[in-house]
Amino acid sequence: SHVGACTGRDHFSGWGLDWINMGLTYLPYLHRFYAPADARAAFVAVRDLAAHYGGHIIGIPRDNLPILDRQDGSGPLWETNSEWEAVTTYRTYEGAQRAILALGAPAFLGAEAAEALQGEGVPTDVYIVNGLTLPDGALSDLVARYGAGLVTVEDGVIGTAETGVRGFAGLVASAADNKAPVAHVGITDPRIAPSEGHMETWAHFGITAEALVAAVKSL
């Protein structure tokens, strides 16, 4: 259930931090690997899961994450009758040549970063990846659309300079190889973390809106 760095102090473990890599490992045997970004997305994912045969893994985020809203403020991003989709367009800005791809729970940080970047004259779109596998051509289309680069963010281990890129970051890095610049925000040193709420833990690992802004500017 609760996965990533926001599992709570009594569940903090290597498995929790490596959940995305575990999902990728089992992906050939699964119907879907779900990574919902808020409680509403989790409801939509569970309903979709129940409607299909086959194996599934779902990483439920903490229920105190913000409920994601539409860009125009007209309401929540997902309703109870929403159809599950692999990728949701979250924020769009005119002239954007860069994009943030958020896997699951840190998606709201992408919106905060995009708003800050817009104020600095760097329009950046934001997409939420709700799970895997992605439809054929989805990543290649995004790479082609955003020639100035892509930034990924995920609440999980993304590797180190010594071990290479892992997780969702690795998936995007492979798709973008020699086609578009990429940068990644995630956990690179999982050895020590504070026994605090998940926002404090994310800040310790550098999973913040400020880190996303810096990553986009580095492209």
Q: At which residue positions do the language-model features occur?
A:
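Thiamine diphosphate
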Residues: 2-20, 50-219
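Internal gly/pro-rich beta-alpha loop/helix module
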Residues: 7-28, 33-50
